[in-house]
C-alpha cells in the first residue's frame, strides 16, 4: 500500500495486487486518513466486480458524514452499476476534479 498526500487529499494505492488485504489495510489504518479527502486508487485491478467496490461503502459513508470526499478510481468498470452513494471514476484527474467540486459545494453550504 502506497500513500501519497497532496494538500488536503490522500491517495491510497494498492501495490500488492491483493484486493482483500488492501481493503483490510485501508480499513485498519482509516483513522490515519480520516481528516483528509481520500482517493482509493484501484487502477491496477482489472477484474473488480460491483460487489468488490461495494465493500468500500461503510468507509465511504463514515467519511462523507465527516464532510470529506471519498473517491474510488478504477478502469474497465460499469459505473452505472454502483450505488449513487459511492463515487467511482475512471481516472485520478477526474477524482481530483470531483473532490474540488465537493469542496466548493461544502464551502457554499450544500
Describe each model-derived feature in a short phrase.
Residues 1-28, 44:
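STAS-typified acidic loop motif
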Residues 54-58:
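Alpha-helical scaffolding segments of alpha/beta enzyme cores, especially the outer helices
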Residues 60-82:
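Short aromatic-glycine-(Arg/Gly/Cys) micro-motifs in beta-strand/loop hairpins
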Residues 8-10, 35-40, 67-71:
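Hydrophobic beta-strand segments of well-ordered beta-sheets in folded domains
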Residues 41-46, 68-74, 100-105:
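Short C-terminal domain-edge/linker segments immediately following a structured domain
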Residues 1-9, 19, 74-110:
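STAS-like cytosolic regulatory interaction modules
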Residues 23-53:
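Short, glycine-/small-residue-enriched flexible loop/hinge segments at domain edges that mediate gating
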Residues 4-6, 31-35, 63-65:
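Flexible, charged surface loops at secondary-structure boundaries
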